[in-house]
């Protein structure tokens, strides 16, 4: 009577969608009384594959083998859960759920709407993504009748964030930082993350201070070739910024979740800064915040779900921004629409908030903390939220009967 559910997604990759797929899997595994899980893994662009070999990875590998055999024998599924961009949604079962990060801009691509409407339910990672899905409309023409129609998402869209990660023991990281105060930023080196401006404005603001910026980044992969390319680009870029006392450190390479949390909790890391144009959710921001780091970021998009508390109070250094059209070079047909907009951090505000954060931490006058995030976003709470968001009818009468059966 368990529902046979096919989880299709890049759950073995080091990517945002990989993180989503693993969260979906953990949610499903928290209710093994309801679901029999099958897995179809996907690649994800140029991103690296995870190297972890733990109980979960072994279970995934065994389940992939089971799935291949089941499909070869003509096996069918009750539910599909597809972790990908909406362009790739398809009907694979009687009940289909699309699980996407959604969008970091003000508008979803028109191609997403009919694909989303093929699903029975769509789950996104933030209130921002949910609102953009629900509010995007296009005027379209019926190719058969010539009639004008309104293109709009018609199916239910639910937002579910990520859970906090907890560790019994964190590995010790020796960072070798020589500066007295250090900001951390974690981002792939691409246009959306706005890393060049983040680094440039940091250098200009702290040019003569004993302050460092640790940049955990890559271009596409965590390999040596990627590191050498990024190191060269960053060195050339910093050379153009002139003489300085402040320092920029490049941290590159594959790091486990435990190692990343050791980085957030390292005694030499004092604050987190990120000035992206938009976030579906903003996982590094979330992890930094619940690890107790003061956060400097833009007050727009997915990160507001956790950087604003349940009473509506901001728990971060809010950098002012302007909503402007996305850059021409990031327009991606079928994903990032040319007519969409995202946030551009204001230079003066970014420098002012970084400086204020620096002074507050030094003087121990940071006015807030994010300790309650561990309760709001606990694993149990988020797994339950995700299972509920699936919208699958569960035969609770059968479960009740099952619980009453006595073992003789």
Predicted regions and their residues:
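Aromatic "clamp/platform" in nucleotide-sugar-dependent glycosyltransferases that forms part
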Residues: 277
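Donor nucleotide-sugar binding/catalytic pocket of nucleotide-sugar-dependent glycosyltransferases
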Residues: 121-169, 320
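Short hydrophobic beta-strand element within catalytic cores of glycosyltransferases
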Residues: 294-297, 308, 314-318
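N-terminal pre-catalytic "stem/leader" segment of glycosyltransferase-like enzymes
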Residues: 1-76, 384
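Conserved donor-binding/catalytic core segment of Leloir-type glycosyltransferases
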Residues: 6, 176-193, 199-202, 213-215
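Extended catalytic core of nucleotide-activated donor transferases of GT-like folds
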Residues: 6-8, 46-132
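A charged, aromatic-enriched C-terminal amphipathic alpha-helix characteristic of glycosyltransferases
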Residues: 341-349, 359-390
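Nucleotide-activated donor-binding/catalytic signature segment of Leloir-type glycosyltransferases, i.e.
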Residues: 224-263, 270-271
């Amino acid at each position: 009577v368990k529902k046979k559910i096919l989880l299709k997604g890049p759950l073995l990759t080091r990517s945002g969608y990989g993180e989503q797929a693993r969260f979906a899997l953990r949610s499903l595994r928290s209710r093994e009384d309801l679901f029999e899980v099958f897995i179809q893994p996907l690649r994800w662009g140029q991103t690296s594959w995870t190297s972890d070999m733990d109980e979960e990875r072994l279970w995934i590998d065994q389940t992939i083998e089971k799935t291949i055999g089941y499909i070869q024998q003509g096996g069918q599924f009750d539910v599909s859960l597809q972790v990908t961009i909406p362009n790739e949604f398809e009907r694979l079962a009687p009940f289909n759920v699309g699980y996407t990060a959604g969008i970091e801009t003000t508008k979803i691509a028109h191609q997403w709407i009919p694909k989303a409407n093929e699903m029975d339910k769509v789950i996104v990672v933030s209130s921002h993504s949910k609102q953009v899905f629900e509010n995007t409309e296009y005027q379209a023409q019926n190719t058969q009748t010539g009639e004008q129609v309104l293109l709009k998402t018609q199916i239910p869209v639910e937002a579910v964030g990520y859970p906090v990660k907890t560790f019994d023991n964190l590995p010790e990281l020796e960072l070798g930082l020589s500066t007295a105060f250090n900001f951390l930023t974690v981002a792939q080196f691409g246009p959306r993350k706005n890393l060049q401006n983040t680094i440039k404005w940091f250098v200009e603001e702290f040019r003569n201070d004993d302050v460092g910026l640790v940049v955990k980044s890559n271009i596409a992969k965590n390999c040596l070739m990627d590191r050498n390319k990024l190191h060269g680009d960053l060195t050339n870029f910093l050379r153009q910024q002139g003489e300085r006392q402040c320092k920029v450190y490049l941290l590159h390479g594959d790091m486990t979740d435990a190692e990343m949390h050791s980085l957030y909790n390292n005694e030499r890391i004092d604050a987190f800064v990120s000035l992206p144009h938009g976030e579906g959710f903003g996982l590094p921001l979330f992890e930094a915040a619940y690890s107790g780091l003061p956060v400097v970021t833009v007050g727009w998009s997915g990160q507001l779900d956790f950087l604003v508390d349940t009473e509506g109070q901001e728990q971060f250094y809010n950098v002012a921004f302007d909503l402007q059209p996305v850059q021409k070079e990031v327009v991606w047909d079928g994903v990032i629409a040319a007519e969409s907009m995202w946030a551009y951090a204001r230079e003066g505000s970014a420098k002012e908030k970084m400086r204020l954060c620096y002074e507050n931490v030094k003087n121990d006058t940071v006015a807030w903390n994010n300790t309650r995030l561990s309760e709001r976003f606990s694993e149990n709470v988020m797994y339950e939220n995700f299972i509920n968001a699936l919208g699958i009818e569960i035969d609770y009468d059968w479960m009740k009967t099952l619980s009453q059966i006595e073992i003789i």
